């Protein structure tokens, strides 16, 4: 029997919704990245985008372990000499909690030609509502929550 090689149109894509309330950010990012890549499917291949769509709600209620809100820094650079700026994760969570969660999930994805295509299937919302009810997303439960 020859080895099965999946093609781009062979897989059916589902929609999953993840509630980020009291879930540690790293564990949430791993679960979402695995769903986006399709690693839970028996037809997984690293060179084919066979993953599912992921909706993350309540990004403003995600948990951080330790003192990461006060001590972990996020950097950005303007491109000019001396243009390095840094903010704590706590400051970023007050303004844009959806971006913090999305950056953590994107950081868990591979950096290759498929990465942009995989990132387009991710939707992150700060509140409990999302505009994707027509897709009938399946609730995805993450077992471990913050203590």
From Swiss-Prot:
GO CC term, one of those recorded: cytosolic large ribosomal subunit
Coiled-coil segments: none
InterPro entries listed in its UniProt record: Ribosomal_uL13, Ribosomal_uL13_bac-type, Ribosomal_uL13_CS, Ribosomal_uL13_sf
The keyword Ribosomal protein is assigned to this record: yes
GO molecular function, one term: structural constituent of ribosome
GO BP, sorted A to Z: negative regulation of translation; translation
One Pfam short name: Ribosomal_L13
Alphabetically ordered keywords of this record: Ribonucleoprotein, Ribosomal protein
Biological role: This protein is one of the early assembly proteins of the 50S ribosomal subunit, although it is not seen to bind rRNA by itself. It is important during the early stages of 50S assembly.
Family according to the record: Belongs to the universal ribosomal protein uL13 family.
Subunit structure of this chain's protein: Part of the 50S ribosomal subunit.
HAMAP family given in the database record: Ribosomal_uL13
Protein name per Swiss-Prot or TrEMBL: Large ribosomal subunit protein uL13
Gene name of the encoded protein: rplM
